[in-house]
Amino acid sequence: MSPTVVSASWLPAAVATAEGGEGGFQTPGVADFWWPVIPFDGTGAWAITRPAIVLLISVGLLAWFYVGATRKLTVVPSKSQFMVEGSYNFVRNTIGRDIIGSKDFLQFVPLLLTLFTLILVNNVFGIVPFIQFPTMSRVGIPIVLTLIVYVVYHTVAIRRKHGVLPYFKSLIPPGLPGWLKPILFGLEFLTYFVIRPLTLALRLFGNMLAGHLMLLVFIIGGEYLLLEGDNLFLNFSGALSFAFSIGMTFFELLIEFLQAFIFTLLAALYISDAVSEHH
């Protein structure tokens, strides 16, 4: 029996093999998220992959859209200007001003807007035909975005405390007994320098990875049952799996927006902690 053919718009590594070949259907896994497009050294670290290409495309699209929409501003906005103003006002007012505070938020709006739009566009690419890959499902990309947030966070906190040493001292609340201070300092250090960055990056990565894997399972599994199933029940199950994947796609779109919003919201929360006098 011939192998099941997976659409070229899906990950090519996720292939259902022929019965009696390599064991039948192979469930999509984490390995399907590594696909060297231009492997300079085989499949090494310097290979240009689909996530890298999609990320560059997203940056180009965002730059083209924002520059084009704001080149000729009018009192009555065009559709593109309306979308730009809407996204800016959403991030500025809902995230920046409401979370960081009206005194300090404006200087951080460009960072927050960049984070929100970049993450959102790259997440939505997960359901765009012929791309269908959420780049945030590659853990290195959320980690880089998190590092940017935390460089800003700690830089602002150190400036507010007028130095590195006063900043570290501020991690310990006043009035504690001497024996408790090293313990609490260790816990606070882990929280601000390890746990918070890890959870911020891994939350985005995990949701995008799990959501895309789920869609792959339903679509590729449905295709296998529909084409390779040897009875009507399996064929019907395959068709049902395809239908369910359509509903899952709309649900995934909601998750993609929420993850972009949550990442940006948490970044604003951490920055607000840095600018706070009580930090």
Give a label for each model feature.
Residues 2-279:
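Selective transmembrane helix interface/packing segments
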